Each structure stands twice: as C-alpha cells, then as structure tokens.
UniProtKB/Swiss-Prot annotation:
It is an enzyme of class 3 (hydrolase). Pfam families: Peptidase_M54. GO terms for biological process: proteolysis. Keywords: Hydrolase, Metal-binding, Metalloprotease, Protease, Zinc. Binds 2 Zn(2+) ions per subunit. One is catalytic, whereas the other seems to have a structural role. Zn(2+) 2 binds at residues 142, 147, 166, 169. Its cofactor is Zn(2+). Belongs to the peptidase M54 family. This is Archaemetzincin. Probable zinc metalloprotease whose natural substrate is unknown. InterPro entries: MetalloPept_cat_dom_sf, Pept_M54_archaemetzincn, Pept_M54_archaemetzncn_arc/bac. Zn(2+) 1 binds at residues 131, 135, 141. It comes from Saccharolobus islandicus (strain L.S.2.15 / Lassen #1) (Sulfolobus islandicus).
Amino acid sequence: MTEMKILIVTLTYIEKSIIDEIVNNLSSYGLEVDILFDSRKYLPISAFNWERLQYDAEKVLSFLKSKYDFNYDSIIFLADSDGYIDGYNFVFGLTIDNFAIIFLNRLREEFYNRKPDLELFMKRVVKEVTHEAGHTLGLGHCNTIGCVMNFSNTVEDVDKKQARFCKNCIYKIENLSKYLQRK
C-alpha cells in the first residue's frame, strides 16, 4: 500500500500508552502516523450547547478545519469531552472530508458510573480512532461482523467490534491508495 499520512492531534491530555497503541494499530496498515500535542488545547466555546452540555461536533470540526491546514490525507482530533450531532443523543466521533474528531468521554467506564479501566478505555479509543480514520480515507460503515467500520450506537457496540479492518475494507483502502498514487 502507498503510504498515506495521518495526523493525530490531541486537544486534551491523552495517556502516552494510548497514543502508542493508536500509532501501532494504524501503522500496521502501512499508514504513516504523526502526532501533534496541541498546546492550545481548547474547543470553541461557540460550539458548546449549554442545554445539552455537549459540543456540536459539526461546529467543532468546522472550526478545527479552519485552523489546521496541513498536508495530510487525514487529520484526526482527540478531545476528552462529549459531542453530538443533530438527530443523535451523542456521537463517539464524526468525520467531514478528511477531518475527524473523537470525543472520549463516553468511551470511559467512569461515564457509566463504573470502575475506571484504562485498558478497556485504550481499546475503545484505538477502535474509534481507527474507525474515523477509515471514514477519512473514504470508507463507509461495514456490515461484516467484527469489522472496525461497524457503526457503534452504544459503548457495548464498540466493545463488540475488533480494532481491525475486515478484508473488504482493507481492499478498498488499498485501491484508494493506488488511485491516489496515480494522481
């Protein structure tokens, strides 16, 4: 596969072990992954919905797209907050074009008043980052059982899927990579 470049931008503190797992997982597909620990570490207050106590994911991504104009195939933001889009109570992540954001709050056991579990949290974050990376690279949702591109409506859905693309999704990424190489 031609190397496609992904930038991961942490907007809040993320444990190094989690970042390492994200890089390892995405790199295993031949993707080049860079990390930017953004010192500004903020989300636009104009995107915060005070009635819902959540960020409007579309507004956040529009804001971030205007601030990060780097030469990457995919730019993925990580934020330790809660997000939504119209029509949904929440989203784990959202992708628009080659930009994505993952909201980490609901991936933590503590959100559900359960005992903290860093290992489970790490697995969930890796799955959702890989999922949104797939979207930024042109993949849609997949119905293959266990594929990381399965839609997740609940954290239990996240737990059921693997952190890996199925064969069909890998094939699609490889074909896209070959197409981009010819351009």
